[in-house]
Amino acid sequence: NQSSSSGIAFVKRIWRRKRFARIAIAKMLMTAARTAPKARGTDNLVLAVATDDTIVEIAEKMKQLAVERNMDFLNRDAENILNCGAVVLFGMKISPLGLNCGACGFATCGEKPKNVPCFFNANDLGIAIGSAASLAADLRVDSRVMFSVGQAVLALNMMPECSMVLALPLAVKGKSIFFDRK
C-alpha cells in the first residue's frame, strides 16, 4: 500500500543521512589529525575511513588474529567496531627526519634500520590521533583509540605505505560501547 512504501522510503532517507553524518564526522576528525602539529612540519600521516563491509572485513581479521596470536581482547575489540558507524584509520610512514637525535635508540638516522620507526613519526601519529579524539569528544561522539584495529589493517595490507596504524572507532549510542568492556 501507499503509506507502507512511503514509510520505507522515509526510513531509507534517514539511513542515508546517518551515513552522511558519520562520514562527515570522520572527515572532520581526519582534518583535525591532518592539521595537528608535526615535527619539522613534515606530514607522513596517511588517513582513511572504514565503514560497512570494510569494518566487517577488519573485524573478521581481528578475530583470526585473536586465535593466531592468543590475544582474546582482539575479539572484544572486533565486536566493538562491528557496532560502530565508522572507523577512522591513522597510518604513519617511516620517514626519518634526519635529526640524528638518537631517540629511536640508534646514534644517527643512518644507523637506524629501515623498518624501525623514527621516534618523531610515532610521536606525530600520537599527536594526530589525540587531536582527532579531542574533536570527537567535543562533538559528543564516543570513540576509543585502538591499536588492535591497526594490526588487522596492517595484516590486510589496507594501508601498504604505513608501518604503524592506529584506529579511532566512532559510535553514537545511548551509552558508550567502549565503557564497560570485558
Give the location of each predicted region.
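Acidic, surface-exposed loops and disordered segments
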Residues: N1-K182
